[in-house]
Amino acid sequence: MASLSAQQQRALLQSNLPAEDSFRVTLQRQSGLQVLQLNLGRLCNMRCSHCHVDAGPDQAHTQMPEAVVQQCLDAMERLKPELVDLTGGAPELHQSFRQLVRHARSLGCRVIDRCNLTVLLLPALADLAPFLAEQRVEIVASLPAPEELSTNAQRGDGTWQASLEALRLLNRLGYGQQGSGLELTLMSNPAGEELQQLTPCDEIRWRKTLAERGVAFNHLIGLNNMPIARFLLELEEQQRTTAYLQRLRGAYNPCSVSGLMCRSTLSVSPQGELFDCDFNQMLELPLPLELASVGLDDLGGREI
């Protein structure tokens, strides 16, 4: 599959963005650090058509080296984030995943595992789900839709059934069950140019459809497709980049600015570079800071 370099992606976005001053306005970071997000590499047991990090089974060479893992462990102690967010690829495939989880939990940090669900069924990771429950890791599980057809179309044949099997496994361990304290959030990420408009009726449909298949969850959230990586390439091939950016512009909600992830998050790449968010990480727009030495004073109030 062809791919676009970060430089090519930035150029395409720049040439297709609406010519408005609002796109040049800066934001200011909040004080402190709420989320330390660690991208452990693009290795994944799946290869989804919409993936904004170009993850797949052929990405073992992108895994975070142990020297950077150690810097992440040290940064947890120095920065004292409220939440450590582990992402990838499939972060669980990194050999230091459990070490990072244990260290974060020992410091009192909440931990989120951004999980594709099917990774929980790999024979080599048979004890992974019990480990997550034991460490009380919060799971944000990606599932395009509660129906089989659209899920398989985006993620491959058989992935819907495998995802349901993994969800039932998590339910048996207490995830998604009232009063257990084990949080299971489903994240819907539809393919193509469709924008998420999750309503209370949508959540009712999700709960009813999945309950009929023996699955329960705590929360449902939605994510729209960022026009980068594989999705940007698809838009370019269909000559739809400008139209999609205009659609995003039309859906802009100014009330969302105060809660943007870049204002309270520090994103770390597998190579140890620092970014405001993982989307900027994929576009190679780093911060002028070093993981080994960054402190809270470097982050608070900084312009984005």
Give each language-model segment a name.
Residues 1-20, 264, 271-290:
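A broadly conserved sequence feature marking short terminus-proximal activation segments
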Residues 4-88, 92-106:
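Conserved alpha-helical substructure of the radical SAM core
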Residues 35, 55-64, 79-94, 105-124, ...:
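Core AdoMet radical
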Residues 39, 265-267:
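Short, surface-exposed charged micro-motifs
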Residues 47, 80, 135-136, 180-183, ...:
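Short loop/turn motifs at secondary-structure junctions
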Residues 94-98, 125-126, 196-200:
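Conserved strand-to-helix beginnings and helix N-cap segments that scaffold or border functional pockets
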Residues 147-261:
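Radical SAM enzyme [4Fe-4S]-AdoMet core and its adjacent flexible, acidic
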Residues 216-248, 266, 273-275, 279-304:
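C-terminal accessory region of radical SAM enzymes
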